[in-house]
């Protein structure tokens, strides 16, 4: 069955759109929470056995997985689509300043790191993504596009 990776920088709305997809009845996994990630040499990485097991599980509909880690590229062949979520920097910073439930992006050092990630990491994600989606529009529209991507990828 179809598996879609949703990736992107902090503040683009990955977790928010995942929550909306779950609300619509889709199976979702946010790898930022739980035991999906471990830190190796200071670098957050997916626990490969757990991700392999997740992607091997039978499922009735599409699976939407959210995450941005250095070893995600190893799993690209296992996903039917890799969707890079993006937003203008001012939108990202506004979201980071006003979000609740996640304090990352509140300090000047963290914002500087996110700026570097946008400059250095986002182009790498863009080069390997199958789709790019600007999340500055309505949440419902972003979720609808992701569902369409899953429908087409599963054919």
Segments (PLM) and residue ranges:
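Conserved glycine(s) of the Walker
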Residues: 8, 13
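A glycine- and Lys/Arg-enriched "phosphate-lid" helix/loop adjacent to the NTP-binding pocket
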Residues: 81-124, 131, 147, 151-155
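Short loop/helix-cap segments at secondary-structure boundaries that form the rim of catalytic
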Residues: 72-78, 124-127
């Amino acid at each position: 069955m179809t598996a879609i990776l949703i990736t992107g920088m902090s503040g683009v709305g990955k977790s928010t759109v995942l929550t909306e997809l779950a609300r619509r009845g889709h199976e979702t996994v946010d790898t930022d929470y739980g035991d999906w990630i471990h830190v190796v040499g200071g670098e957050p990485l997916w626990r490969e056995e757990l991700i392999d097991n997740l992607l091997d599980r039978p499922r009735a509909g599409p699976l939407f997985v959210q995450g941005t880690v250095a070893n995600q590229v190893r799993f690209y062949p296992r996903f039917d689509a890799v969707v890079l979520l993006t937003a203008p920097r001012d939108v990202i910073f506004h979201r980071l300043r006003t979000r609740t439930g996640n304090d990352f992006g509140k300090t000047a050092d963290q914002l500087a790191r996110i700026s570097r990630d946008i400059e250095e990491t986002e182009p790498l994600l863009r080069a390997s993504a199958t789709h790019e989606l600007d999340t500055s529009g309505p949440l419902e529209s972003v979720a609808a596009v992701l569902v369409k991507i899953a429908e087409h990828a599963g054919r």
